[in-house]
């Protein structure tokens, strides 16, 4: 806090946290979310053959985080769909991206400099949703740390966590694309951000919520814009996780290698012992047979 005061960021952070998200930031969030839907294989054909299914998929991309959060907190799953302004705005974006003549709207928002602006604004919405989700969960469960973390996490990356269900709506089933097994950068960042905001909400992190929102938004915007501009699918956390995870959880291939060697030693010893025992046994039988023959000749 003293550092933020020295840098005169306290007032800026407070003003930034009070900026309304609707309609400009929400519009950017809807545009980027539905763009990613159109990138999915078969999404364009689905919009032509089954427009209702395509619209439902678009609404999941835009509001899936709210649905999951309501599910966790035991609230009506369709509660957010009572927000007519957001639903109409998201529906208009879906129609323009999929059905605009000559794909003019799609080409404009896909132009990289324009797209980077929308991506940056989407991360502003993501961080704010994490903070609001944790505050909402804290209202119901004052000491439920894991509930707050889970709610903030799904608020920030709900659509990714619902990817398998969204695929079913498109008639696709890819269980290997489970987001929990293969977390993308936004999903990991949402989880880490949910932990930070939970610590701040429970007063274990000595920083104001406005300052944390401002700092974490800068981090998310910088990383996501860089990854989008370079067309990279890597994560800034990979290097850190590469050092920490083997220490805390062991190497992923170490245990398998040990078991393979262990099994190999048994399998190598078993057949080898059998092969070595078999010739020894046959030699004894041969020698015994030769002795019997000699005894018969002697008789």
Swiss-Prot record:
Q: What catalytic activity does the UniProt entry give for this protein? A: K(+)(in) = K(+)(out)
Major localization listed first in the record, in broad terms: membrane
Q: Which domain of life is it from?
A: Eukaryota
Name of the protein in its database record? Trimeric intracellular cation channel type A
Q: Name one GO molecular function term.
A: identical protein binding
Compartments (UniProt record) = Sarcoplasmic reticulum membrane; Nucleus membrane
One GO biological process this protein is involved in is: endoplasmic reticulum organization
Give me the residues that bind a 1,2-diacyl-sn-glycero-3-phospho-(1D-myo-inositol-4,5-bisphosphate), please.
122, 126
Give the source species: Homo sapiens (Human)
């Amino acid at each position: 806090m003293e550092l933020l005061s020295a840098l005169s960021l306290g007032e800026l952070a407070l003003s930034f946290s009070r900026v309304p998200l609707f309609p400009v930031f929400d519009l950017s969030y809807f545009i980027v979310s539905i763009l990613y839907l159109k990138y999915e294989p078969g999404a364009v054909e689905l919009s032509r053959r089954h427009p209702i299914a395509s619209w439902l998929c678009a609404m999941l991309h835009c509001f899936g985080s709210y649905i999951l959060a309501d599910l966790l907190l035991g609230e009506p799953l369709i509660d957010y769909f009572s927000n007519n302004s957001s639903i109409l705005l998201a529906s208009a974006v879906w129609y323009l991206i999929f059905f605009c003549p000559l794909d003019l709207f799609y080409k404009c928002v896909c132009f990289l400099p324009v797209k980077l602006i929308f991506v940056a604004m989407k991360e502003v919405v993501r961080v704010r949703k994490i903070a609001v989700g944790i505050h909402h969960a804290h209202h119901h469960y004052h000491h439920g740390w894991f509930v707050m973390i889970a709610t903030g996490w799904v608020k920030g990356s709900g659509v990714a966590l619902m990817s398998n269900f969204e695929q079913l709506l498109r008639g696709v089933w890819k269980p290997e694309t489970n987001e929990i097994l293969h977390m993308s950068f936004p999903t990991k960042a949402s989880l880490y951000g949910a932990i930070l905001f939970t610590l701040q909400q429970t007063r274990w992190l000595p920083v104001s919520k406005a300052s944390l929102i401002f700092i974490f938004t800068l981090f998310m915007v910088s990383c996501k814009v860089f990854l989008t501009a370079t067309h990279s699918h890597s994560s800034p956390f990979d290097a850190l996780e590469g050092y920490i995870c083997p220490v805390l959880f062991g190497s992923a291939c170490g245990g398998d290698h040990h078991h393979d060697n262990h099994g190999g030693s048994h399998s190598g010893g078993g057949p080898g012992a059998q092969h070595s025992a078999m010739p020894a046994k046959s030699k004894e039988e041969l020698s015994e047979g030769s002795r019997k023959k000699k005894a018969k000749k002697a008789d």
